Amino acid sequence: MEFLLEQISQITHGVVLNRIKPKILSEGAEYPILTISQLIDEENGVWDYEVPTALVDKKKVKNLNLAKEHSIVIGLTSFHRAAVLEKQHEGKIIPSNFVSIEFQNGIMDPYYFAWYFNEHPEIKRQRMIAIQGNSSV
């Protein structure tokens, strides 16, 4: 049986940080931000990195896309990989350079999905086509 990813999961684009800033500092709450460098550091066994924060308008907090344990993020810029978020990332803001995926009712193992997305030759080929012409300077 075949399913589209959107049929078995919630796919959410990360938030643009400038859109959640408070107009008045006293109306803001500080939240940690998930970054690509954190995920790369963790892949390389580095765990003592700094976690940047953002000031968020308190009225916008309830609509934030916050990281949850075992959800998946896919980097849309230089990372271009899927990563399963662990406990230490819970509550971090997922910024606009990521898409997050949460599977419904455990229908798919997030680690299997991340492995498949990152390692399957056909998916790699499709990713290369999608990012062709995009580069970081």
Locate the predicted segments by residue.
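A short beta-sheet element
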Residues: 56-64, 69-120
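Short coil/turn segments at secondary-structure boundaries
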Residues: 18-26, 48-49, 128-130
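Short proline/glycine-enriched turn/loop segments at secondary-structure junctions
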Residues: 23, 88-89, 135-137
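Short, basic/aromatic beta-hairpin or loop at an interaction surface
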Residues: 38-53
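Specificity-determining recognition surfaces
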Residues: 119-137
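Non-catalytic DNA-recognition/assembly elements of restriction-modification systems
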Residues: 1-22
